[in-house]
């Protein structure tokens, strides 16, 4: 019954994914983490890991970011939540409270008057906490670098983990920065000893 008359089982074709134009292979096929994971699953049928590695894996897949939009870069920051980029498919979602956030995205010109508020919000975030500096103004003052009222980079107020360049940076650049933060967390771990 149905569309075929033969009694054969229909099998879906191998998914192709996004191909890397340089290598011709699917993107991520040479990632050491996933290659190790696949080889362990095919050998044993289950995965043996440490608690540190499990917690680090869980943290990278559930980053909650807090918006600290100070200027025009905040518009591009909003774009990554829209359907075209859909940042939630990578396990990141916006939160309104610093007490529920892992990542703060500083987007825009940081003034001297706003710097204490930035530090206060950063101090309210639970450990481990991460900061992404988005745009030329947040990275180093940008166009307003020589103004008396502008902090020449938010790294003078809070420690920054990832810098996203551009004026304003595109939503793709911010998404790439978030993916690099996930890679950094995976590489360095999150548990202090």
Swiss-Prot record:
The family database entries (PROSITE patterns) matched by this protein are listed as: COMPLEX1_20K
What's its membrane topology? Peripheral membrane protein
Which residues are noted in the entry as [4Fe-4S] cluster-binding? 72-73, 137, 167
Name this protein carries in UniProt: NADH-quinone oxidoreductase subunit B
Key word Cytoplasm present: no
The molecular function terms in GO held by this entry are: 4 iron, 4 sulfur cluster binding; iron ion binding; NADH dehydrogenase (ubiquinone) activity; NADH:ubiquinone reductase (non-electrogenic) activity; quinone binding
Q: What class of enzyme is it?
A: translocase
Which keywords has UniProt assigned to this entry?
4Fe-4S, Cell inner membrane, Cell membrane, Iron, Iron-sulfur, Membrane, Metal-binding, NAD, Quinone, Translocase, Transport, Ubiquinone
| Swiss-Prot/TrEMBL catalytic activity | a quinone + NADH + 5 H(+)(in) = a quinol + NAD(+) + 4 H(+)(out)
Q: How does it assemble?
A: NDH-1 is composed of 14 different subunits. Subunits NuoB, C, D, E, F, and G constitute the peripheral sector of the complex.
The record's Gene Ontology cellular component field reads: plasma membrane; respiratory chain complex I
Physiological role = NDH-1 shuttles electrons from NADH, via FMN and iron-sulfur (Fe-S) centers, to quinones in the respiratory chain. Couples the redox reaction to proton translocation (for every two electrons transferred, four hydrogen ions are translocated across the cytoplasmic membrane), and thus conserves the redox energy in a proton gradient.
EC? 7.1.1.-
Cofactor comment: Binds 1 [4Fe-4S] cluster.
Q: Which family does it belong to?
A: Belongs to the complex I 20 kDa subunit family.
What's the chief localization of this chain? membrane
Q: Where in the cell is it found?
A: Cell inner membrane
Entry's Gene Ontology BP terms: aerobic respiration; electron transport coupled proton transport
> Which InterPro entries does its entry note?
NADH_UbQ_OxRdtase-like_20kDa, NADH_UQ_OxRdtase_20Kd_su
The protein's required cofactors:
[4Fe-4S] cluster
